[in-house]
Amino acid sequence: AAAVLLDPRGRTLMIRQPNGDGAIFARLWQFPAVEAASDPRETLHNHLAGIIPRTAGWDASKLAADMTPLAAARHTVTFRNIRLLPFLVRVPRLPLLEGAQTPRLAALDHLAISSATRKIADAARHAL
């Protein structure tokens, strides 16, 4: 499950795992995401609450009601079939995270992103 956080200016939050965590998309910019075996909304909500500290001036615990499911997509990498379950999360402002970027959703082409991230961005843009 992936969260497309979107502020009123059309900006979104992009993060990357420089140390190889999340090896499939290591070192590429991506939306905050987590593997969800059961309830993707709850799993993603818990993941966001874990990676975004309250000290970032943002309270992830209030997100559950604001998570709008987007069109699911499929992505294949080597021998893995991945089902992408994105959620659009409208926020008054994006959290401040060290090392993160906040580009406009409409202008992600200048970042190194995977085709899976591109599919998620396309689903979000289509829903707007």
Model-derived features: where do they sit?
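Intrinsically disordered, low-complexity, charged terminal extensions of DNA damage-control enzymes
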Residues: A1-L128
